[in-house]
Amino acid sequence: MAIGVPRPLALEKPQSVDLAQAARYFGAHGEPDAATLALLQKCAVPLLAAAMPRAVWLLADTPALTEAGLLPGEDVHKHLAGCGQAILLAVTLGPGVDAQIRRAGVGDIAAGVASDALGSALAEQAADAAEAQLRQWAATEGKYLTRRFSPGYGDWDIAVQPLVAAALDTVRKAGLCVTDTNLMTPRKSVTALLGVSDHPVKGQLAGCGHCVLRTRCEYRKRGKTCASE
């Protein structure tokens, strides 16, 4: 059973980095103080200049993804309930962002951490932009999409990353590789799955019970969840 053909998705670089989101990744609680905001603003300029967003996606029947071993666990199937098809998506900011994060951290640990947080925020913005394009495509096809669901959510183990990358041919299509330990390079990259249906669907968040970050989650420490942010 064939999976879909990977297709590139043209992304424009965001005009700015979401500093509020970056501040949360940086560890700020509530509104960042003036010093934190100034540091983020300073580090955002070279980081944004270094970004070269690329994306690739494919459409496949959910049975084909299951047969290919791409959908292990229960939570991802709950997310895809009512969806006969699904989209696999990969987005990366490119190696320049990783290099800029390393440069920023030389002799200035705070700048390195701030740049890392900014990179995470910018990667999410790029993923949001890619998702917005896919939603436009779905609307023209009379289809409905769930929210994004990424490896590592619930019991959808990150060990699936190499299979996702292979299905999307990310090395050739986006310059995105996966290491032997299932980490993505460039680091500031996002992979995700969205359910596709002919009727409105939302998908189901996995919740905290199975999440691999549940013991060290900053949101849970503040009595919140990532879904509430």
Regions found by a protein language model. Give the residues of each.
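Short cysteine/histidine-rich metal-coordination sites, predominantly Zn2+-binding motifs
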Residues: K224-E229
